[in-house]
Amino acid sequence: MHWVDATVKNQQGPQIVSTGISPSGPIHLGNLREIITGDLLFRGCRDKGLESELIYLADDMDPLRKKYPFLSDEYEAHVGKPLRHIPSPDGNGLYSDYFLNPFIKSASELGIFPRIIKAGDLYRDGKMGEVIRIAIQNRDKIRTLIETISGRELEKEWFPYNPICSSCGRINSTTGYELNGDLVSYKCECGHEGKSNIFKEEGKLPWRIEWPAKWKVLGVTIEPFGKDHGTVGGSYDTGKAIAENIYGYPAPLPLMFERILLKGKGAMHSSTGNVIPASEILSFCPPEIVRFLMSRVPSTRHIEFDPGMGFLSLMDEYQRIVKDHKPEDSRIIELSSPFGSDEREVIDYRHIATLVQIYDDPTKILKIIKSTGVETSLEDISKIMTLAKHWIVNYAPETFKFSILPKTQVVKITDEEKIVVSDFIHWAQLPDSQWEATSIHNAIHIIIKEHGIEPANGFRIFYSILIGKERGPRLGFFLSAMDKKTLLERFKFVVSSS
């Protein structure tokens, strides 16, 4: 049983799966794990026959915590203000939407279509008013729960509601101290004193209270979350206690997920710039592979993502399990598909990444791919060509990149190597020789073996003639993709001129 189905097997009745983020910076591959995990759980419930909904909560009432390296100096003046009250870095709209909207687009490309809920809208529309009132009325009980479970002591003046200062606009510099009717009296570090209406967009609950309050308001039944929230005494533990003891609401089924690390760079953080934005990964990685990255392993296992050659290995792994289609892999394939279909035909990305360095003609590449027995379309080939080109320029190691040498460029090879190349030319001109990858590979292997040459050294002869390197793409596929007449002319020139 796939880990998704095992997680939701005991769920009954309608389900609301909740995920979310604070849109304070570029929303990246690491953040994608949350929404993809949420979507996997949503699909697990739906496939179980349960009425289900996926919601995505944008915490746009969170304050800007500091001026991040990717922001201009003018944002120093906005530190402490709610993200939805800050101008966008491009000067067009809101700060929170600037980072949220591209992510929503990326999610749709991944086949994820949650109901988007903005925290600020919940406060603006008065939906948080009663849970705020309950929190303030139970201030002492909540303090005891948080201090007992988390093991940390709250400040003496701690108050379970953070008003927005009507003078300076900050939410992290105020202290509420009294609720009269619907109004919370507060003082701000800027010197201003005022009143905040709990039924308006004039403040917010602290995170450890806001999370369980939203469970109740939104009817959440399942929620995946990062390991930082799932530590002993962490925000899930306090949230569960507050939900059950203060709000009388059962805590949702939890599922902790591990981080995604960038190979050699560690965990991704928007604040440090160590990220691959969601939109960027989809510029070189097919959507089903992003989903496969998450669905193939339990959520509790950390993932190390290598955008270089490791990415090609991931592509190869997906291609292999789709081709083999073992019963135990069918659910992974299904959950990896953006739109839930069982897509059996997979185009060899590694092969395309080689071909686009030889040809820039999708029609030519389509013909080559079809010759390998894969049925696909010009549209699909063009899409993968675009992805592969982006990967080559931005992530491929130099060892993978190449360019074809001019037909008349001199390359020095030994007399023994000339004989090897001449033998290959002879084989290629035989009436019964087949100009396809496997036959070419086998022919070269036989020829170099007859001359007592190690395979790596034998292959190096052909790579040096064609691309001036000691290593290159899979040789059989590489040669079969090239024009036979042009290729043999190149080999004959080198044999005769060196």
Question: Over which residues does each language-model region extend?
Answer:
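Active-site cores that bind ATP or allylic diphosphates and position pyrophosphate for catalysis
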Residues: 112-116, 120-278
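Residue-level signal for inorganic ion chemistry
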Residues: 28, 135, 286, 462
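Secondary-structure transition/capping motifs at alpha-helix termini
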Residues: 43-50, 245-250, 497-498
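N-terminal catalytic cores of NTP/NDP-binding nucleotidyl/phosphoryl-transfer enzymes
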Residues: 1-70, 212-233
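Charged, often glycine-rich, active-site loop that binds/positions anionic groups
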Residues: 62-78, 131-132, 266-267, 273
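Basic, alpha-helical terminal appendages of large translation-related enzymes
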Residues: 1-12, 27, 53-55, 143, ...
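A glycine-rich helix N-cap at a beta->alpha junction
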Residues: 75-110
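Catalytic adenosine-cofactor/nucleotide-binding cores of aminoacyl-tRNA synthetases and other
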Residues: 231, 236, 258-394, 467-498
